[in-house]
UniProtKB/Swiss-Prot annotation:
Subunit: Part of the 30S ribosomal subunit. Contacts proteins S8 and S17. May interact with IF1 in the 30S initiation complex.
Basic residues composition-biased segments: 109-124
Record family assignment: Belongs to the universal ribosomal protein uS12 family.
SUPFAM superfamilies assigned: Nucleic acid-binding proteins
UniProt-listed Gene3D superfamilies: Nucleic acid-binding proteins
InterPro entries in alphabetical order: NA-bd_OB-fold, Ribosomal_uS12, Ribosomal_uS12_bac
GO MF annotations, alphabetized: rRNA binding; structural constituent of ribosome; tRNA binding
Gene Ontology cellular component list: small ribosomal subunit
Name assigned to this protein: Small ribosomal subunit protein uS12
Amino acid sequence: MATINQLVRKPRVKLVDKNNVPALQECPQKRGVCTRVYTTTPKKPNSAMRKVARTRLTNKYEVTAYIGGEGHNLQEHSLVLIRGGRVKDLPGVRYHIVRGALDTAGVKDRKKGRSKYGAKRPKA
C-alpha cells in the first residue's frame, strides 16, 4: 500500500480504455462506399473464402468490413452501412456490413435469426 506522501508525489494513473472501432468515431453506425469487394482466406486452422469489402466512410476513413450471410449483391460504388464487430479469424477486419440497409440486400430464404441479416418474415 502506498503512503499518502508517495501518492502526493506520484498519483495513481487512470487506465485508458482501448477503442476497438476507431473509424466509427463513437457512432453506432457509419455510411460508406465500397471501393473493392473481394474474398480472402481466414487464419489457421480455419478454411473458407470470406467475403469482405474495402469501404470508404463518410469521415474519410478507409476500412475493411465483413459481409455476413450467404450470398450478397455488393459491388464497387455500392452504398453500405457499417457497424462494429470484428471477425476473429480475419486479421484487420473490425467492422461488419449491415444487411438489408442502403444498397445491401437482405439474405434470401433466411428463416432464423432474420433480424441480423435483414430478411423479411416469410409468408405463412
